[in-house]
């Protein structure tokens, strides 16, 4: 009987407890969330201000400084940022109807300097070529531009220029090592000197970096015809290929992202604008920036580092087509534009060198550094398979170009350079370290030193 009473009492208390429970106050909780966030934001600002880190945090854009330096900021023809596109990059590019977009002149960062003509060069390039100058232009995309390099001096253009001028100085120091301007009459002496390398034209060699991140062959063709030829180049060097593999075949050239949506779809443009504004509002708060800068330290992926002129998310393999017909169209576009480039340079009497740019899957995996092995693993097997198929097609296209114009173009394959590349050459799928750029510059130099237009050809001996 007693146990029954205790059970009833316990049951009664349990019911009373159940009746006393109340639902959570959802509205006060929802209201308190922004209040707490505001208080945390104010507290973060106070702490940052007291510690004297305000300027340091204000300069942080959610990525390492060198990444922010090289990210593109897209400007319209009025030189104002596009509504709906990120404006966190420091490398300003402006829309141009003919070439898609181009670098804004007279800008600099800790990593690069762009001259008033819009070339990556420390000094201006006058339209009228100085009498003693031998002028060479380097065209291409981000690899030729020198993406992620610490300064202008680490780029292919700068290293090639130094190598060419070193050759001229060497000719002056040791003239006996090169073929003389006048050949000897006697055969015994002639047989000796004809084995010596020809002298290169003497003068001040200048290699101008006209590459623009994101450019494909269509951009380069328009750039050459409209912007480069007026500068009277003595030779043209092109380093490209990769962008044509990731650019859909229905596009003639790389353009500012989402421009078709902006022009033809007002609701779509407005939605992109709202999304970007909300994203910037959140990521610009001291709370988020402080958490990223001092705690999370986010690093861009290999795909993000390799894709420089797109705001579309996704991995590199998504930009490389799995459709063989689409791949043929992309490579066919590349081949057609290269033919037109050869036609232009041939008509102007300008030597042309076309280099198929390096890519990390072209290296022997046993020769990759631990960092490069991690990049390759992150890119994945699907990417590797697709990019190798693409490069095989590009290589065939360049071989056909060389066969069609044997006297007007020299093609080079940089996809596999294991013997000449340093231990660590790649910072992502396609961009190179200074040491990697030096290997390319040396290969370009060897070819250029053999171009008849850049050589001193001695007269034939009198018989």
Question: For each predicted feature, which ranges?
Answer:
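Extracellular serine-dependent O-acyl
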Residues: 40-42, 346-364, 369-371, 387-423, ...
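Solvent-exposed loop/turn segments at secondary-structure junctions
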Residues: 142-145, 212-217, 242-247, 359-362, ...
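Second-shell loop/turn segments in exported
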Residues: 142-151, 209-214, 326-331, 426-430
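Serine-esterase "nucleophile elbow" of acetyl-processing enzymes
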Residues: 114-210, 223, 237, 257
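Serine-dependent acyl-ester chemistry module
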Residues: 243-396
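Histidine-centered active-site loop/cap adjacent to the catalytic His
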Residues: 334, 406-410, 422-463
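Proline-aspartate-enriched helix->loop->beta-strand connector
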Residues: 228, 232-237
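N-terminal secretory targeting modules
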Residues: 1-135, 149-150, 168-177, 231-232, ...
């Amino acid at each position: 009987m007693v146990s029954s009473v205790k059970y009833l009492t316990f049951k009664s208390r349990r019911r009373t407890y159940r009746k006393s429970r109340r639902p959570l106050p959802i509205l006060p909780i929802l209201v308190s969330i922004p209040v707490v966030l505001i208080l945390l934001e104010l507290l973060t600002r106070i702490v940052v201000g007291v510690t004297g880190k305000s300027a340091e945090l204000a300069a942080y854009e959610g990525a390492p400084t060198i990444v922010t330096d090289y990210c593109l900021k897209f400007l319209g023809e009025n030189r104002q940022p596009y509504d709906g596109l990120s404006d966190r990059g420091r490398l300003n590019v402006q829309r141009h109807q003919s070439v898609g977009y181009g670098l804004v002149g007279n800008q600099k960062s800790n990593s690069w300097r762009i001259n008033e003509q819009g070339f990556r060069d420390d000094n201006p390039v006058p339209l009228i070529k100085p009498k003693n100058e031998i002028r060479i232009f380097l065209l291409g995309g981000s690899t030729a531009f020198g993406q992620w390099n610490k300064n202008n001096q680490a780029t292919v253009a700068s290293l090639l220029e130094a190598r060419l001028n070193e050759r001229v100085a060497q000719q002056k120091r040791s003239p006996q090592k090169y073929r003389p301007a006048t050949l000897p009459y006697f055969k015994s002496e002639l047989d000796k000197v004809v084995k010596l390398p020809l002298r290169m034209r003497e003068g001040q060699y200048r290699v101008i970096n006209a590459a623009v991140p994101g450019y494909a062959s269509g951009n380069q063709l328009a750039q050459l015809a409209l912007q480069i030829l007026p500068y009277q180049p003595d030779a043209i060097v092109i380093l490209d290929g990769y962008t044509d593999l990731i650019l859909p075949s229905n596009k003639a050239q790389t353009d500012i992202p989402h421009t078709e949506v902006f022009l033809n779809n007002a609701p779509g443009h407005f939605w992109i604008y709202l999304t970007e504004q909300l994203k910037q509002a959140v990521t610009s708060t001291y709370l988020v920036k402080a958490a990223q800068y001092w705690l999370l330290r986010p690093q861009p992926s290999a795909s993000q580092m390799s894709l420089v002129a797109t705001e579309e998310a996704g991995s590199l393999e998504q930009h490389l087509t799995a459709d063989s017909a689409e791949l043929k169209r992309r490579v066919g576009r590349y081949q057609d534009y290269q033919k037109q480039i050869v036609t232009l340079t041939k008509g102007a009497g300008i030597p042309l060198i076309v280099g198929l740019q390096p890519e990390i899957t072209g290296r022997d995996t046993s020769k990759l550094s631990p960092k490069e092995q991690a990049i390759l693993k992150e890119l994945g097997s699907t990417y590797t398979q697709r990019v190798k198929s693409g490069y095989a097609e590009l290589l065939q296209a360049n071989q056909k170009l060389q066969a069609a114009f044997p006297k007007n173009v020299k093609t080079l394959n940089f996809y596999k350079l294991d013997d000449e590349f340093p231990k660590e050459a790649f910072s992502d799928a396609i961009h190179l370290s200074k040491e990697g750029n030096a290997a390319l510059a040396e290969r370009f130099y060897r070819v250029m030193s053999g171009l008849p237009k850049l050589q001193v050809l001695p007269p034939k001996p009198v018989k």
